[in-house]
Amino acid sequence: MSRYLESRVQELEDIMAIENLKPTYLNACDSKDVELMKSTFKADHCDIDFGPVGKFNHREDLVKLFTEVACHDFMLESHHAHNPIINIIDEVNASGEWALTYSLINTKDNSIVTLQGRYIDEYLKIDNQWVISKTQFIGKSSLNLQVEGELLKVIFAGSPA
């Protein structure tokens, strides 16, 4: 195989690996798999900016918040990433953007949240594995509902920014 063809195949393999990385992270969040979620991020310093949820410089800080806030049976979450745009910069660096549609049913306080936005990510290949080294979530729209008997009350609808 020519060097050019080898490099093209490697680029496609890298794109596919990153296109599997983000859903691995989101599925781990939905299933409350803390170790799997943690493994998708760079082990040492990484930049995580989830806006109002928090900013973190290390994956352990995100794990702490995730464990305290989201890892409960009453938090029924569903993350759906779509429309990925992945750019392989070089052999070990890549960037990407994803659209996100998120739903949360909180059975403890009878609330429902839907959120749309986008992730802007940077990835690093370490020991032949892609990990998230930087991520930012930018919210576009949110619908927050309160369940009151058989009625839904709109708490907020619009742009969270």
PLM segments and residue spans:
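A solvent-exposed, acidic/Ser-Thr-rich amphipathic alpha-helical stretch
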Residues: 34-100
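Solvent-exposed, flexible loop/coil residues
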Residues: 16, 52, 60, 142, ...
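A beta-strand edge to alpha-helix "cap/lid" segment located at domain peripheries
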Residues: 2-6, 71-161
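A structural signal for alpha-helical segments
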Residues: 13, 54-57, 111
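Short linear sequence motifs
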Residues: 18-19, 34, 59, 112, ...
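Short, low-complexity N-terminal intrinsically disordered segments enriched in polar/charged residues
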Residues: 1-27, 31, 35-39
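Intrinsic disorder/low-complexity signal
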Residues: 12-13, 18, 29, 48, ...
